[in-house]
């Protein structure tokens, strides 16, 4: 049991730590959207939101590849226990299957916050957390219709919770339109738009990460 707890903690720390980079970039995308909406530059705000969504998909794919490649080396720095590390890899690899979903959810969270829809953001995240909490014991121990999946069940519960959060954002986006429009016509990469997102987001992320 102790090994399972340690493996869960190690895998969770790794995936959560790497998602911080995406969260900070999305945060400053939020700032830019709010800034350009306030400046009455609707097209630029739409471009930042749409291209931010596309970048979040790319970030999710990159996180999956880089985290999968570096997971074992990272875990060895936390524990020399082979059993713990193998279970942590099981957890981490399954959570990483949902990387794109997680990065999209983070981006939508910041888009809704940028237009003042804080209640939607809070509601979506709470629903995702509650689903995760509810599914954890069911999928870990095999309660009800679920088979006992152990550490894999915890990972899948996390992924399903994140998927639910993203779906709720999408429902709100289409059911109650917000000032920012995510449309294909804004998807064409604009060097100036993308450079603004990274120029603000990356230094801020490094600034927050270096002291720790």
Regions found by a protein language model. Give the residues of each.
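Membrane-embedded alpha-helical bundles of multi-pass transporters/translocases
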Residues: 1-39, 43, 82
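Alpha-helical transmembrane segments of multi-pass membrane transporters
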Residues: 67, 120-149, 163-169
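Short alpha-helical transmembrane segments in multi-pass integral membrane proteins
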Residues: 1-8, 40-100, 146-202
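Alpha-helical transmembrane segments of multipass membrane proteins
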Residues: 18, 22, 26, 59, ...
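Membrane-interface junctions at transmembrane-helix termini in multi-pass inner-membrane proteins
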Residues: 101-125
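Alpha-helical transmembrane segments and their helix-entry boundary regions
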Residues: 15, 118-122, 151-155
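Hydrophobic/aromatic residues within transmembrane alpha-helices of membrane transport systems
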Residues: 17, 21, 33-38, 43-45, ...
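Hydrophobic/aromatic residues in alpha-helical transmembrane segments
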Residues: 29, 33, 70-71, 108, ...
């Amino acid at each position: 049991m102790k090994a399972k707890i340690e493996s869960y903690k190690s895998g969770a720390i790794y995936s959560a730590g790497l998602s911080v980079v995406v969260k900070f970039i999305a945060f400053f995308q939020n700032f830019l959207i709010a800034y350009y909406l306030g400046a009455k530059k609707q097209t630029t705000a739409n471009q930042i939101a749409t291209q931010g969504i596309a970048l979040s998909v790319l970030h999710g794919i990159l996180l999956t590849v880089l985290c999968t490649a570096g997971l074992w080396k990272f875990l060895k720095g936390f524990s020399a226990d082979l059993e713990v590390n193998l279970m942590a890899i099981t957890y981490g690899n399954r959570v990483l299957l949902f990387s794109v979903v997680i990065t999209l959810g983070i981006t939508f969270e910041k888009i809704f916050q940028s237009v003042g829809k804080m209640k939607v953001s809070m509601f979506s995240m709470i629903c995702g957390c509650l689903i995760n909490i509810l599914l954890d014991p069911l999928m870990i121990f095999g309660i009800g219709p679920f088979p006992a999946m152990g550490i894999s069940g915890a990972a899948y519960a996390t992924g399903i919770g994140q998927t639910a959060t993203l779906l709720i954002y999408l429902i709100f986006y289409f059911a109650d339109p917000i000032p920012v429009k995510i449309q294909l016509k804004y998807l064409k990469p604009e060097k100036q738009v993308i450079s603004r997102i990274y120029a603000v987001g990356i230094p801020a992320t490094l600034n927050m990460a270096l002291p720790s």
